[in-house]
């Protein structure tokens, strides 16, 4: 079974990683976890024109590394097979695209991200992933 965990560094995404680890520990057979973070670079494109070459990319990479650091540390302790994926662009589109190209069986993600303007009950990224995914999506 291949599992894709979409994270953004929020408390909800940390809960998603913990849930996935508990779920996979209870399963037998071949299991693999891929933890993915997507850096939404749409609002930073304008800055690329006015900043030194590579500075926006460096910022996005640092942010991605911060998002993944906790998950790496946590999953290393579990001894579960895992890898990390960093993508750039629209988060929901990249999550759906990766779920298809990676032949995943399930997506696990938090219901709300880090944005302060998220929807009341469920975040906009989670809504779009649930609406467009061809595989089961578990929201934590």
Task: Briefly describe each language-model feature range.
Residues 34-36, 83-87, 138:
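General small-molecule cofactor/ligand-binding pocket signal
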Residues 8, 89, 111-114:
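Histidine-centered beta-alpha loop that forms part of the nucleotide-sugar donor binding/catalytic region
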Residues 97-140:
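Gly/Ser-rich helix-loop-strand patches that form or flank binding pockets
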Residues 2-53:
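Small/aliphatic-rich secondary-structure junction motif
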Residues 21, 69-76:
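Class I S-adenosyl-L-methionine
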Residues 1-2, 140:
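Absolute protein N-terminus
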Residues 53-66:
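A short acidic, glycine-rich active-site loop
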Residues 73-107:
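Structural beta-alpha unit
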